[in-house]
UniProtKB/Swiss-Prot annotation:
Belongs to the phosphoenolpyruvate carboxykinase (ATP) family. Pathway: Carbohydrate biosynthesis; gluconeogenesis. Keywords: ATP-binding, Cytoplasm, Decarboxylase, Gluconeogenesis, Lyase, Manganese, Metal-binding, Nucleotide-binding. GO terms for cellular component: cytosol. This is Phosphoenolpyruvate carboxykinase (ATP). Involved in the gluconeogenesis. Catalyzes the conversion of oxaloacetate (OAA) to phosphoenolpyruvate (PEP) through direct phosphoryl transfer between the nucleoside triphosphate and OAA. Binds 1 Mn(2+) ion per subunit. The gene is pckA. One of its GO terms (biological process) is gluconeogenesis.
Length: 539
């Protein structure tokens, strides 16, 4: 569909001049033809796989580049944003001057000028009251395909008078030669101006920068209105019971929320307002490393025509080697949410959550597969956001390393973590929600806890059997662990049983507990933070 009201003249308002042609909100069929155009070269060109989906490579950037993220510091953001150069917290919100912003904007608009452009107008947020109308501008067909998959696709009538609240200009082919003089990290940049309401991308082809860029914007706007903004997946049961799954990349958000017994609300980004939980997105972005049809049939079956694979190895016959992580461990597929059969329709939203699940992938092998949290422990573990950072989701990470990421998504937080915790706690108190800590990582055997066991644990949480189970407390961490659960090997519920001796667990537990305590020190400068210390590990 082409909307005649959008012309090259309109783009001059953004500083983009002499545009050859505008491909506006292209259909999937057109994008398919464009991506497979044999005259394309380099990272623009897609490859057809035997599953019907197109596969692309994103170059040296196979994950986000958090060190290249900047936000203009001005009157809008000076006193509200959680800046990287203020306080003890660690984040990626590096300040950018107005002067450098203008320079970067000039580079991107110059790159996009004189080109044939793809423009996708879409929504971020399933609630009409708080959604963002976003306009994506790119010269690369598959990047247009990515945002068409990942954001909410407007109906034709919604495009007639579409007025963007935010503009994303993707100039992946341009870099910044003056980065050193400007005090920046590299020639690549992902920059935001919350006053002009524009995101600029230069140097990186990775599609996830557009997805997570808008998540950072929602993370700024919504909590200031008292709405929880969450890095989580969500689903709903037959009785309308809603569960949310917090977790960093690779901990199981997409896998565990994609459940044939429950309808999917969304797999990564949600809000929680007075009406309930709602998706920000219109698609899913699943990791595909070691994907198998047997273990994850819903995700495997979603990989078909209109899905877009990233950085997978495609054999000469078009078949995909999902086990090959030679390009990156962070191989991905994006697909429109309706590629999953069991979803909430017609709008990706449901009622208030009653189960809140924190997913962690513990590389130390210390934490139990599941524990039930008290109210204070809920806040403590939400602010701690512990996991092992898994290989490949960020540039330069190849081995699992322990990490603490506030609210299970520090990279995307625009405000101080305590603001997200306050809003979440209010929502949980109002709905009577219970929180759980689920370890999808490793145990003392050195093996990862199986998807089968984790799914049985999630079932026990959702059907209430965990709440009715007898529990005992794990020393040092004071976590309440069930003595037995249906379908779960009883021996693994106590992590100490997976070690050759209790002393081995004690040694590793002490090391991990020290990391928790050190990390939480940054929150002890307020009475509320100090009061939560007792909910953490005790040495």
């Amino acid at each position: 569909m082409r909307v005649n009201s959008l012309t090259p003249q309109d783009l001059k308002a953004y500083g983009i001049n002499d545009v050859q042609d505008i491909v506006y909100n292209p259909s999937y069929d057109l994008l398919y033809q464009e991506e497979l155009d044999p005259t394309l070269e380099g990272y623009e060109r897609g490859v057809l796989t035997n599953l019907g989906a197109v596969a692309v490579d994103t170059g040296i950037f196979t994950g986000r580049s958090p060190k290249d993220k900047y936000i203009v510091r001005d009157d809008t953001t000076r006193d509200t944003l959680w800046w990287s150069d203020k306080g003890k917290g660690k984040n990626d919100n590096k300040p950018l001057s107005q002067e450098t912003w203008q320079h970067l904007k000039g580079l991107v608009t110059q790159q996009l000028s004189g080109k044939r452009l793809f423009i996708v107008d879409a929504f971020c947020g399933a609630n009409a009251d708080t959604r963002l109308s976003v306009r994506f501008i790119t010269e690369v067909a598959w990047q247009a395909h990515f945002v068409k998959n990942m954001f909410i696709r407007p109906a034709d009538e919604e495009l007639v008078d579409f007025k963007p609240d935010f503009i994303v200009m993707n100039g992946a082919k341009c870099t910044n030669p003056q980065w050193k003089e400007q005090g920046l990290n590299s020639e690549n940049f992902v920059a935001f101006n919350l006053t002009e309401r524009i995101q600029l991308i230069g140097g990186t082809w990775y599609g996830g920068e557009m997805k997570k860029g808008m998540f950072s914007v929602m993370n700024y706007l919504l909590p200031l209105k008292g709405i929880a903004s969450m890095h989580c997946s969500a689903n709903v049961g037959e009785k309308g019971d809603v569960a949310v799954f917090f977790g960093l990349s690779g901990t199981g958000k997409t896998t565990l929320s994609t459940d044939p017994k429950r309808r999917l609300i969304g797999d990564d980004e949600h809000g929680w307002d007075d009406d309930g939980v709602f998706n920000f997105e219109g698609g899913c972005y699943a990791k595909t490393i070691k994907l198998s049809k047997e273990a994850e049939p819903e995700i495997y079956n979603a990989i078909r025509r209109d899905a877009l694979l990233e950085n997978v190895t495609v054999r000469e016959d078009g078949s995909i080697d999902f086990d090959d992580g030679s390009k990156t461990e962070n191989t991905r597929v994006s697909y429109p949410i309706y590629h999953i059969d069991n979803i909430v329709k017609p709008v990706s939203k449901a009622g208030h959550a009653t189960k809140v699940i924190f997913l962690t992938a513990d590389a130390f092998g210390v934490l139990p597969p599941v524990s039930r949290l008290t109210a204070d422990q809920t806040q403590y573990h939400f602010l701690s956001g512990f996991t092992a950072k898994l290989a490949g989701t960020e540039r330069g990470v190849t081995e699992p390393t322990p990490t603490f990421s506030a609210c299970f998504g520090a990279a995307f937080l625009s405000l101080h973590p305590t603001q997200y915790a306050e809003v979440l706690v209010k929502r949980m108190q109002a709905s009577g929600a219970q929180a759980y800590l689920v370890n999808t990582g490793w145990n003392g055997t050195g093996k990862r806890i199986s998807i089968k066991d984790t799914r049985a644990i999630i079932d026990a949480i959702l059907n209430g059997s965990l709440d009715n189970a007898e529990t005992f407390n794990l020393p040092m961490f004071d976590l309440a662990i069930p003595t037995e659960l249906p379908g779960v090997e009883t021996r693994i519920l106590d992590p100490r049983n997976t070690y050759a001796s209790p002393e081995q667990w004690q040694e590793k537990a002490t090391a991990l507990a020290k990391l928790f305590v050190e990390n939480f020190e940054k929150y002890t400068d307020t009475p509320a933070g100090e009061a939560l210390v007792s909910a953490g590990p005790k040495l």
